[in-house]
Amino acid sequence: MISMNNDTLAVIKQSIKTIPDYPKPGILFRDVTSLLEDHTAYKATMDILVEKYKDQGFTKVVGTEARGFLFGAPLALELGLGFVPVRKPGKLPRETISESYELEYGHDVLEIHVDAINENDKVLVIDDLLATGGTIEATVKLIRNLGGKVNHAAFVISLPDLGGEKRLQAMDLELVKLCEFDGE
């Protein structure tokens, strides 16, 4: 078992590479794939999440496309729960419902299978990064529209300057963030 102490969190944070001017000039991109390449950091991340969320009565873990799958699916497996993917339109084969959300320039849409969540489900949402909160806001709306209860969301990285934390807290979500980075 590994605890969420400062040394462990430092290992995780230091494994995340910062790529300047990607995908456009002026952006400091936080590359979670470098964490995945580091067995020690990836395992520490998963161990912390398992320890935090075990025995809390969750019935499903929902992960958002695509990097949320990299943390959500193994977490669900370790917790003995089902994993539900939330995806871009046209990627899920069964009947879906969709939720539109605003981006900095334009909008996007997410979908979930209509039979993946029901009123008996207590759901944990996970994604790699919390920025503006739009993706998770749409994901939570999808889950709640299907009758699921969702009050917890976990992120490996948070960019608090972009306002996502406040946006999601206004939806009555308890947030866990393993690393914070300043800026965009």
From Swiss-Prot:
Chief place of localization: cytoplasm
Keyword set, alphabetical order: Cytoplasm, Glycosyltransferase, Purine salvage, Transferase
GO molecular function terms listed in the Swiss-Prot or TrEMBL record: adenine phosphoribosyltransferase activity
Catalyses which reaction(s): AMP + diphosphate = 5-phospho-alpha-D-ribose 1-diphosphate + adenine
Known pathway: Purine metabolism; AMP biosynthesis via salvage pathway; AMP from adenine: step 1/1
GO cellular component, as recorded: cytosol
Compartments (UniProt record): Cytoplasm
Biological process per Gene Ontology, one example term: adenine salvage
Annotated EC: 2.4.2.7
Pfam assignment, any one: Pribosyltran
InterPro entries: Ade_phspho_trans (IPR005764), Adenine_PRTase (IPR050120), PRibTrfase_dom (IPR000836), PRTase-like (IPR029057)
Similarity-based family: Belongs to the purine/pyrimidine phosphoribosyltransferase family.
HAMAP family (UniProt xref): Aden_phosphoribosyltr
Subunit and interaction comment: Homodimer.
Its job: Catalyzes a salvage reaction resulting in the formation of AMP, that is energically less costly than de novo synthesis.
Protein name: Adenine phosphoribosyltransferase
Native species: Shewanella sediminis (strain HAW-EB3)
